[in-house]
Amino acid sequence: VAALALSVGALSLIASLPKSDPNVLVLAHVTAKSTVKAPAKIPAIAKSRPVQLTIAKIGVNTEVGTLGLQPDHQIMVPDNTHTVGWYKDGPTPGEIGSAVILGHVDSTLGPGIFFYLKSLQAGDRVKLVLADGTITNFVVSKVVQYSKSNFPDRLVYGSHGTRSLQLVTCGGAFDHATGHYESNIVVFSHLVSVSIPKSEVRS
């Protein structure tokens, strides 16, 4: 199984790496034609863990587990290559900040749940159902490949003052000596709508 080697530093916004950086490959980004404007006002939601992830474009419809930190401060990874995990020390998808969901690209047995993640394009939709029944809808803004040796922890996990969701998996070249991929694929997306059960609507 190709593990996701990610660490978390201080959770605050930093500038993204320069476009000319050889460790960064932009696979997709928002253009004038692909830009999707968010509604002027999206209602606040209560904290509730995500339980179901759907990405229709790549055929993903799976349960969401929870992930924490290992003793060495590396992010845990899902035990099953066909499920995903939400980093539970971050915000609920739809709250202010960066919610992060991780999944495997493949294993020795074949493709994993995020095998086609890198094929997403700006404007594609991502839906998450929360435990309280709230549905949060996100739109992809860009897809970037980062070298693991220069992974921008704070950019991916930090609070940007917006309601964002990052999807992370492995990618790039595979190092047969270590048994791991050399890069990570990160899909950046932003909240565009929520559907809150009547019992949960705040007055």
PLM features: residue spans?
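N-terminal Sec-pathway targeting helices
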Residues: 1-3
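Solvent-exposed, non-transmembrane regions of membrane-associated and secreted proteins
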Residues: 7-203
